[in-house]
C-alpha cells in the first residue's frame, strides 16, 4: 500500500506500508546467516540486547574495551554503536571501532542516543562519528532531526512525532549515503528515495528500558539479509509484532519484558 504524505508546503512524499508478512522473507535470510554482531551499547541494556540478538539467531559480543574493540570489529559481520553511557574509555572505543569499520569497508549501525543542542559534548562526538559513514542510522524523531540540523532539540525526551521527521530522515540518508530509521508510533525507514512505514506495536514498547537499543542491534543483524533498506524495516516489523503479541498476555512492564523476548524468539514469531 502506498500513501502520499505532505510535509510543509512543497514536498510530497510517497510512503509505502511495510508489514510483518513482507518482513518474513528477509528475517529468514538474516536468521540463516547467524551473524556475529559486535555491540558497543548502553551499559543499562547490554543483557537485554544480547538476549534479543540470540533470540533472532545472531551471535552477540558486548566487548567495548579499547584494547580489544579493533579485533572484534574487524571480525564481526556488523557493528552497532550507541552513545548512551558515555565515558572517556567508551568514546575512545567508539572512535576506534567506527574508524576500523570505515577503513575495512564494513557496515555499522549508529544509534545517536540523546543528541541535542544542550548536550554539546555528546552531540559533537556524534557528528565526528558521522564522518565514518554508518550504513544505518536509527533514532527517534528529535535525534534524526537534530543530526540533519533541522531542529534544535532542547529536551532529553523526544518531543516530535516520527512523521514530522520524514523530511529530515530523507535528507540525512542522502547526505550520509545511509539508510535512516525514525522510530515512534509509526517507524519510517528510508534510503533517501524509498520510504517505508511500519505500523503496529504496543504502548509498553516505549516504557520498557532498552527497546531502542535492542532494535538498533536487531537492525545490525537483519540488514545482512542482502537488502539494507528492507532488512532494517524487517527488524522494525518484528519488534512491532513482538510488542503486539507480548501485550496480549501481560498486565505490566515486568511480564511484558519477558513476553517481548519470548515473542522475538525464532520461530515463535510465525504463530498467529
Swiss-Prot record:
This is Hydroxyethylthiazole kinase. It is an enzyme of class 2 (transferase). It comes from Dichelobacter nodosus (strain VCS1703A). Belongs to the Thz kinase family. It catalyses: 5-(2-hydroxyethyl)-4-methylthiazole + ATP = 4-methyl-5-(2-phosphooxyethyl)-thiazole + ADP + H(+). It comes from the Bacteria. Its cofactor is Mg(2+). Its EC number is 2.7.1.50. The lineage of its organism: Bacteria, Pseudomonadati, Pseudomonadota, Gammaproteobacteria, Cardiobacteriales.
Amino acid at each position: 500500500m502506498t500513501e502520499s504524505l505532505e510535509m510543509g508546503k512543497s514536498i510530497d512524499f510517497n510512503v509505502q506500508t511495510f508489514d510483518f508478512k513482507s518482513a518474513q522473507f528477509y528475517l529468514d535470510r538474516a536468521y540463516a546467516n547467524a551473524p556475529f554482531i559486535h555491540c558497543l551499547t548502553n551499559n543499562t541494556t547490554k543483557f537485554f540486547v544480547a538476549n534479543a540478538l540470540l533470540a533472532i539467531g545472531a551471535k552477540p559480543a558486548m566487548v567495548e574495551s579499547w584494547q580489544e574493540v579493533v579485533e572484534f570489529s574487524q571480525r564481526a559481520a556488523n557493528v552497532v554503536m550507541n552513545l548512551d553511557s558515555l565515558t572517556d574509555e567508551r568514546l575512545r572505543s567508539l572512535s576506534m571501532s567506527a574508524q576500523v569499520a570505515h577503513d575495512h569497508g564494513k557496515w555499522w549501525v549508529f544509534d545517536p542516543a540523546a543528541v541535542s543542542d544542550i548536550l554539546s559534548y555528546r552531540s559533537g562526538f556524534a557528528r565526528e562519528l558521522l564522518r565514518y559513514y554508518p550504513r544505518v542510522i536509527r533514532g527517534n524523531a528529535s535525534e534524526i532531526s537534530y543530526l540533519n540540523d533541522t531542529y534544535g532539540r532542547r529536551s532529553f525526551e523526544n518531543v516530535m512525532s516520527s512523521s514530522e521527521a520524514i523530511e529530515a530522515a530523507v535528507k540525512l540518508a542522502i547526505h550520509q549515503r545511509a539508510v535512516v530509521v525514525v522510530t515512534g508510533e509509526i517507524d519510517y525507514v528510508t534510503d533517501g528515495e524509498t520510504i517505508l512505514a511500519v505500523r503496529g506495536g504496543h504502548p509498553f514498547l516505549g516504557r520498557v528500558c532498552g527497546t531502542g537499543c535492542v532494535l538498533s542491534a536487531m537492525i545490525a543483524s537483519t540488514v545482512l539479509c542482502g537488502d539494507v533498506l528492507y532488512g532494517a524495516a524487517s527488524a522494525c516489523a518484528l519488534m512491532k509484532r513482538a510488542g503486539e503479541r507480548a501485550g496480549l498476555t501481560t498486565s505490566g512492564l515486568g511480564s511484558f519484558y519477558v513476553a517481548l523476548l519470548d515473542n522475538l524468539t525464532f520461530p515463535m514469531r510465525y504463530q498467529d
